[in-house]
């Protein structure tokens, strides 16, 4: 009593306290960062190593395995995967959430150093690492195009000037430059001309290397001067290499231009990048795992004018893709939904109270509670994201509940003629414990979420804390500001209501009277109600088992990512054509705004595409519908597949795959894995629950296998090293010399001119100079035949691995796909030597599925304990919790009706319903107990009176919560796929709960009261109407 009086009789202090809460919230709001979702990125580090010319199998055994053994000893590594292709190895380390990325990076460097002695001596450089996840979609893609500069020159500007500067921006983890390679002088040799002149490829290589050197020459001094010695020992352009003398034949000089075509070109001609229909260089920017995407993008944009000034005016620097606009639009949609929810909730209060003065009170209490929450969010290091703003949207219905309960009870006393200040004090005292019980039990629902580990726990923690803080502030406001405003603003007389609102008042009275009559009938047919209650419990179990489930709703971020997978023996020229064909098909779609793509590098048969869709208000289809439409058109392209998926804000794991979900096959027997992977992949491709099934196992690449006749080689005076050197010189794009420039270093690349290597007959033109100086054709001592060879070798841990990726067809859920895969594996009879398990997001889904029921049970148990402590009773908490089954049925039926799978967002809705619907029972039970203790009423009379007395606040609080969630259901635009499942769950649960709990709660109350009397051996009371 004294606590409430302190605030009611000191209005100035109470107002200033509320102003202080509001000001702190405004300051917190201004300092909060903006993000699509809470920070849930796993710390990921990528280790790269290269050994030019080495086969994938050689890279896997000699480079990947030693590094894996050393890196695998690092503490906190949750997953280690590697992929080895021609000349390169990439190892992805995913760490536990609580592992500091900088500390992990130091451990990675130490592990690389420890493995250095086990690595091949021919590696051109030590392995390097980057603190970025290569499987993440870029947060921004910049393109460089020009009608004046070549692709190599553009690449030079990008890699030398732009990429280093952008990498230094806070939040940037990696800048990957694609579409070409650095400028180089390329020497394309003519095999026939070399043969005619008696010059070997090694002779050419040695001559070029000796002609381009950079060594210190020293200095000259006399008594007073010093001269630095400088020579023309470096050749920098193709024109300078053209007249280079490489050999003398019969006294005549053989110049490089006589046996080769020398051009200013690029290091690797097997690279191509495009934006829309124009050749381009791509800068793909990824953020650090812990970085904020909006802040990072804003920092990059602020730097762009300065970057533009560092490159020539003839180069066009454009933003081809930016992830931030859809994120900002999504948050704006949530903010609008929040405002609409507040307005609707206040409208509900006005309709029920039919008083402008009374409506002002919750209209003040709600903003104070919500705005004050921002201060706590800032102190907790949270951000303004879809989940935290949804928490505040839902909180509008909660925070007004407390004010409604207090306000309605005070208004009831005023209508009975009590003076305002006395009514405020008395009314608050009567419901103070009720409000405390409702708020604390609601906060208790989220305690299990705070203790939940892994990605789901990290994802839901911000939502739970934000909502809990809003409820606690609301509790404080409802017991201080609300009664003070009631005492000083409301009048003792019955409020005059407008004529147009009288109809609503009469309707409410009629509803209350009808409810009273129906409740009397129900209390005389309690067994029927008990059967209904048991039926809802059984229906809950059946619906939960049968409803489709997924991890997280599929988002429409306005960005698609595509992976091209072509025939494993495809040439680069053909692959570049496939890239152009696919880009044209996508560019012609009316929903597409921009397309960028690239191909080449160590995997010639693959490529990547990034598609920016038009804003949501300019297209009628969702991202998934656009993918479905494009899939039909893309399937007509022969010899290659383009797999599209919508970029998501949550992507787990470091595997680069062509689809959203992964299923990994592991084996210590590589032959068994290669035997069973095609069988499993083909089986999964037939399943209607899966789409875009593909695999990263590529072991059918075309290979030309040369077999040396060592006896013949010995007789001809040729060794294996000379033969291998010949092949490397001819076909390996061998970097034979370095050109030093002030800003960068460039290579001289030697190979047989591509004009002479268009078919296998090119091998017949190759020759080796033996130890007697004679030219010996390769065909004299070697035979060759085509064979198959892997294009890549993949590991997980230290086991051979193959990852099958898949998307979900429209109308199918991840639980459908998971069950179908499990059935297929059983039907195939896969041996125990090949192990299958879900990976990435699918793995987290499996783990979440196993913990969902436990989480719900834990939440219910926590609420029971809190209520038991508050009521000092084992029985009354059970009465209150009996409201939950009907809410669960309503929520699950609503999800089924809207064809929405049960996701992590829907789970949040279920947890919220546990907190919401029990409020009705708390109000009933509190007043029933009070009537029994002080009114000398029987249990049936007490609960009947409590139900009628609390009918109006129950309807008000339920409708406030329902109208607070309704905008989430009806909202469209960016991010609606996240908001709608939450709104559907809450609205469905509230509607069903409101229909049933008004009747089931009184029946359960009487049942437990009889049970209590029976066990306490007290005389059974007679129930009367």
Swiss-Prot record:
Keyword annotations: Cell inner membrane, Cell membrane, Membrane, Transmembrane, Transmembrane helix, Transport
GO CC annotations on file: plasma membrane
SUPFAM superfamilies given in the database record: Multidrug efflux transporter AcrB pore domain, PN1, PN2, PC1 and PC2 subdomains, Multidrug efflux transporter AcrB TolC docking domain, DN and DC subdomains, Multidrug efflux transporter AcrB transmembrane domain
Bilayer topology annotation: Multi-pass membrane protein
Record flagged with keyword Cell inner membrane: yes
A Pfam family this chain is assigned to: ACR_tran
Positions of transmembrane segments: 3-23, 333-353, 360-380, 387-407, 431-451, 463-483, 528-548, 853-873, 875-895, 897-917, 953-973, 984-1004
GO molecular function: xenobiotic transmembrane transporter activity
Induction / repression: The mdtABC operon is transcriptionally activated by BaeR.
Compartments, as annotated in UniProt: Cell inner membrane
HAMAP family xref list: MdtC
Family membership: Belongs to the resistance-nodulation-cell division (RND) (TC 2.A.6) family. MdtC subfamily.
Known function: The MdtABC tripartite complex confers resistance against novobiocin and deoxycholate.
Subunit note: Part of a tripartite efflux system composed of MdtA, MdtB and MdtC. MdtC forms a heteromultimer with MdtB.
Name the UniProt record assigns to this protein: Multidrug resistance protein MdtC
